[in-house]
């Protein structure tokens, strides 16, 4: 399975848009984030802390920071023994509150800065609040998960060939949280830079990765039988995608109109 995964990454890496994103992801390490996210503590040249960038990143202290750190206790217990040992080699240094993307507006998102063998050995963990699934209102008969952070973490592990070794969950303040590394080897592709063959290649890669993820988390034979050998499934996806794009443009125009009207 690992050999298949390595081959897949190598093959997809030959696609120009993906190759550029992979190069960027290779540089997205904790050591690289150290200079971006932290600063030297004034008067203490050997110590570092989060570098505030309000409102995007704000340091958290006192009882709030203590609550976040305390929540790591239950998180450690759910990690595999080797991961738990690795985490024990790091100590928490600072905590910050991070403004998250549009899909998580209004949710709590914390970052914890750890140090291992000094400032040159950093680790950044993200503790992100996870609400109920967006599907839950439409699935009244489904058994609700006991923990939304666990739901997301186990879903990622099921769909990804290799997931974040520090992926896990915790709870505090009556809320469920997902725990993962912050920006560890993450990369993205700017769609504005794509056109023609590049855009088609990118769409093909996205479709393949989505299909592989579903095949890993479900029964691939059942999925293949449901899809069949004809063009019906592909045509249905294309129709849905076009309708979704139209709805997105409509929503965006209504949002702009509301903004101009002061609503």
Q: Where are each of the predicted segments found?
A:
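Conserved ATP-binding subdomain of kinase catalytic cores across diverse folds
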Residues: 1-28, 75-263
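Ordered core of a single globular domain
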Residues: 40-93
């Amino acid at each position: 399975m690992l050999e298949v995964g390595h081959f897949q990454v190598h093959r997809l890496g030959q696609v120009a848009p993906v190759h550029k994103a992979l190069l960027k992801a290779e540089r997205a390490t904790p050591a690289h984030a150290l200079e971006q996210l932290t600063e030297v503590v004034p008067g203490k040249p050997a110590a570092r802390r989060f570098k505030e960038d309000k409102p995007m990143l704000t340091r958290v202290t006192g009882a709030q920071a203590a609550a976040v750190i305390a929540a790591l206790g239950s998180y450690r217990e759910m990690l595999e023994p080797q991961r738990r040992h690795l985490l024990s080699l790091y100590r928490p240094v600072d905590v910050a509150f991070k403004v998250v993307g549009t899909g998580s507006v209004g949710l709590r998102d914390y970052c914890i800065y750890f140090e291992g063998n000094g400032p040159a050995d950093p680790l950044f963990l993200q503790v992100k609040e996870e609400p109920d699934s967006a599907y839950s209102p439409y699935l009244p008969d489904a058994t609700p998960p006991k923990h939304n952070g666990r739901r997301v973490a186990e879903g990622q592990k099921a769909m990804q060939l290799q997931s974040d070794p520090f992926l896990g969950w915790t709870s505090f303040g009556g809320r469920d949280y997902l725990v993962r590394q912050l920006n560890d080897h993450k990369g993205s592709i700017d769609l504005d830079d794509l056109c023609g063959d590049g855009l088609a290649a990118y769409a093909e890669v996205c479709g393949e990765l989505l299909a592989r993820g579903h095949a890993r988390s479900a029964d691939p034979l059942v999925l293949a039988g449901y899809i069949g050998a004809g063009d019906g499934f592909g045509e249905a996806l294309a129709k849905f995608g076009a309708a979704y794009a139209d709805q997105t443009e409509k929503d965006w125009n209504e949002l702009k109109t509301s903004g101009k009207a002061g609503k």
